[in-house]
Amino acid sequence: MNKESLFESINKLSDYECINPYSSVVDLEYNETESYWKSGNIQELYSISRSGRGETDHQKVPFCGGIIIFQKQALEKLSGWNEEFWGWGAEDDFQSIKVRNFLNHLQVKDKCYHLWHIRGNIDRDLYFRNLHLYNHYINMQKEGLSEHIEKTKDLVGDFDKIKKMVK
């Protein structure tokens, strides 16, 4: 992403509680990533003109996926990130729902460049568990989400929170 755009986004935190400094993700290919690592020339990335995820296809980029900037008190207002999600999947989607419902937020029109890397194996059982949990939360009304946030606020920073959440 363009560093000037990132700094502009950070400077807008006085007006917004949460900012996503990009709206699409360009997934770099192996050779593009390797070339960037060798040259260190960020302009090479900026010269890539293809569309990113979410621009011309059905893929969505979660508001809270990847780079996300919060005011500290805004993150506290949301009770942080929901730690009921384990492994990979859906935690950023749920955080996005909380942001859209409870915070003054901004999504900047810019591209983010995702370096190519080997993808790890996803634990499908945990992934489907996360989807089940996510479906539970997306079916809540705003009042139910608010109650959930209030209920979990005292668990932020508590190392024994998982034990308390399953009781």
Report the location of each language-model feature.
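Conserved catalytic core of nucleotide-sugar-dependent glycosyltransferases
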Residues: 2-83
